[in-house]
A protein has these predicted regions:
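Single, function-defining residue in the core of a domain
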Residues: 54, 92-137
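Compositionally biased, intrinsically disordered low-complexity regions enriched in proline and serine
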Residues: 7-9, 35, 81, 98, ...
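Active-site-proximal, Lys/Arg-enriched surface segment
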Residues: 9-93
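Short flexible/disordered coil segments
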Residues: 8-10, 15-19, 100-110
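Short, basic interhelical loop/turn and adjoining N-cap
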Residues: 1-7
Length: 137
């Protein structure tokens, strides 16, 4: 599905909001098709490294453990933090939230992003009991 979305990124007639709404509609149709009683939603903060970030807007310093440095330790790299929420108890995953962000002046906190992921997921699936899970990392 990502390949289909990439061709729309530079299309000025299609906004990121419209892409997200389409992604959410696909997710809602998938959940309805499987008829799950409860949804288990994994919330995953990740860091994306950009190899040549010199001209990119809002690039941040992120903590990367994969691949490690020469000593096998985590390292600092240039890139973007992101947060995803995904239904994981169906035969196919369903994205309920996906957001890249940057540590700029406008950025409030990662906790605000976490709350937005939970709020968005609750708005998309108000009739389903939700169980949110995350790792301790």
């Amino acid at each position: 599905m990502a390949r289909r979305i990439y061709r729309f990124i530079w299309n000025r007639r299609l906004s990121s909001w419209q892409l997200q709404q389409g992604l959410y509609a696909i997710g809602q149709a998938t959940v309805a098709r499987y008829g799950a009683d409860e949804l288990v939603v994994a919330i995953d903060p990740v860091n994306f490294e950009k190899p040549y970030p010199h001209d990119l807007e809002g690039v941040s310093t992120v903590h990367k453990s994969c691949p490690p440095d020469r000593k096998g330790k985590a390292r600092l790299a240039r890139g973007y933090p992101a947060l995803t929420a995904c239904v994981v108890n169906l035969p196919e995953p369903v994205v309920t939230y996906a957001q890249w962000f940057s540590y700029t002046r406008e950025f409030l906190s990662e906790n605000v992003e976490l709350m937005q992921a939970i709020t968005t997921t609750r708005q998309l699936y108000p009739e389903h009991p939700l169980c949110f899970v995350a790792d301790s990392g």
